[in-house]
Amino acid sequence: MCQGIYYLINNQEVRSEFSNPRACLPVRIKGGALAQLPWGRRRQQAGNLPLGGWARLDAIYSGHWDRWRPLPVKLEIRQFMERDIEERHCWFDVTPGKWIQGLIAHWQQERRVYVVTITPEMDDALYERWPRILSDSVVPRT
């Protein structure tokens, strides 16, 4: 479910977990610059956007997020941390050339970014959810 992230911004390393109420995610904005936006919303945080830090892809497709004017974005994350079904933490590298999909949600002046997640297709998957990892280029089949 992507509980932690590692990225570089302005040549500074950032490692954070969702449990930190000040956690931000690196969003690639128009023009190529990186911006840091608040990662989701926690119970103790004021606001009207959804609680949590993740947006299920099937919920996006079903229109659940429409009321928050969702905007798909690229998250420039180098590593992410998942907690498996036995509560063990494991860090995973994001392959160069790939990126994690995010969603910016809006409510009046409030903006937060959520990690888009998918459900693993394998019956014996160790993780309940996985970040949606995409690529700018499509490799032709040979």
Residue ranges and their predicted role:
Residues 1-142:
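Short linear sequence motif anchored by a di-proline
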